[in-house]
């Protein structure tokens, strides 16, 4: 007689093993109809699964996050059902859930086309309209093998070989179609109406380019059509903001096949890059950092000492010269330790904060490259703080404060923090880890910031804090990192003389705020849709004459602004003023200055914003002061 305890503490007693669906029915017909699955003693199970013991039960519906994940997973199986009906010779591979959607990898004799995707989606809708039950059968291993052998599903057989310890497996039947899965899945296709197939891409079996190529059909699914419509609107907005499209339209940068994963910065984009670098340089100088520059090509001996050669060599670009092996640095840390090691340090010299705008290269897979967001050549706002154990908390707190200030200057207020603690495999004593984790937690708490704890997610050499930004579309971007390291100073012989005149290894704090300049600029482009705040805009003001008579004064205004440290340019083309205003509005120049005869006479400019707001006519000096205030506000003006 199982006693079922529900989330509100109420209990229900049954005189026989009972399914999740039956428990839901005993509560109410409405809940039974909405039941997707259950969570028994904290474990997700199918609605049809029996409970034969006293247990806690949470009914899972589409309103729950787990319910939406189950809907997405079941939609992937529905893709399989539709594909096998339309293309019977296709071989189904795997169909997992991903962030906000799902995909299915498929082997087929020809590439799918957009028309094929439309046909698959239409067939899926027809199958949903049949309102059929999805039937789960736990099946002995040998029978599972026979099922997929008889259907010619070679990839499923290979996946079964990967699970030698599984004696029985869940088979889920969508009418005549069958798929293998741990589940759970929806009990009926009526839950799958709010879906859409989104794109096609290539993939490889087991993710290895040496293996056979597959086709990947992506889709998204939601609890209801309202959520689906909101998602589609968000995706359309994100496409409008795609940094690759805006990068071309605003003449910021380009990439090309001859240099995959490398960025060709154009004058406009390089201006943004330089403003970013100059800003970070000033911020770091004000906060006690010493800027250094280290080599890009370093002998493998150093990478062997640091451990990178053994653990990271496949991601490093290497070369050989005069019988010596070299690597282009994928990160700056070992080189920074070399600078620290020049001369024995005293505890009085700590903390020592070494910063570098370090150019790094990593041999990322070509399929992973994405505009300037995921590249092979990038520059980090990298710094390493060498300090004593006693200084860990103060240095961490100072960095957290600095990071929040920097993000606010770029217009980001919604910051998410995660604290990752010790993994099972690690270096350093338990006491050292205790102190390090306590230092990071105390630093976060002293800043009054909420954070998510991620037990076991730290690196083997120390705990870390991750800083993520939420942009205007609600997307979360992990950018900043504060990583404590007990390992590298030991491996590379970094020492200092303590107060007791003993040699000790410093703690090393790896830290970055932006992450990489390239990716951060990509985030800024998409966040602002290319309409950078005045302080970042490649051109802050454009001066336009109405006729040739005002050309000389327009050039004088340009000189005045540029000599004042601003970025202004003239547009003296013999075009209608409306045409010029529209063109520079599309180029997202913050301020558009129009000069006619009256402005020449009064030594003034008529000022418009790119949003079309008429700020009126004002003396040049007044505009200069207004622009100076806008630049000084940085991105914080977007928060007011």
Swiss-Prot record:
Ligand binding (Zn(2+)): 333, 384, 510
Entry-linked HAMAP family: Thr_tRNA_synth
CC terms in the record's Gene Ontology section: cytosol
UniProt main location, coarse: cytoplasm
Gene symbol of the encoding locus: thrS
PANTHER family: THREONINE--TRNA LIGASE, CHLOROPLASTIC_MITOCHONDRIAL 2 (PTHR11451:SF44), THREONINE-TRNA LIGASE (PTHR11451)
Protein name: Threonine--tRNA ligase
Family label: Belongs to the class-II aminoacyl-tRNA synthetase family.
